[in-house]
Regions:
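Interaction-mediating elements
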Residues: 1-128
Length: 128
């Protein structure tokens, strides 16, 4: 069921919403992993939000990658992302005032990138 918009709260829109989502995802990653990405870009297209993060690896993870342990780092990143799922969804729902129906995460080692994808419940049509 689609959330009802709450007009009493000023919610960010447009570029401000994109920036707010990027900031909250970076902050959550920093709190949970000890270091946040150095770059983040959020794109919103109707019911899909994609956050692309750059330079995400901690120094410990980079040390392991440099010694051919990329798979172990990717496994650990998947565990972090699964553990952060609830917090990420709650943050995006609070910022957009919409329900997240699906959340997906992926990481890439070289180049050092991550993507967080949020699928939103479609907005209810405006009353006529």
């Amino acid at each position: 069921m689609a959330r009802q918009r709450n007009a009493s709260h000023d919610r960010p829109e447009g570029g401000a919403l994109n920036a707010a989502i990027s900031e909250v995802v970076v902050r959550l990653m920093a709190q949970r992993t000890g270091r946040g990405p150095t770059k983040a870009r959020t794109t919103i297209d109707r019911d899909v939000i994609v956050v692309v993060l750059q330079n995400t690896l901690t120094s410990g993870e980079q040390f392991l990658v440099d010694r051919d342990h990329s798979e172990q780092v990717l496994d650990m990143r998947r565990a972090y992302q699964e553990a952060m799922r609830t917090d990420c969804i709650a943050a995006v729902e609070a910022l957009t005032d919409r329900t997240v129906t699906a959340f997906m995460s992926a990481n890439h080692i070289e180049p050092d990138l991550a993507a967080e994808v949020f699928v939103l419940e479609p907005e209810a049509p405006a009353p006529v």
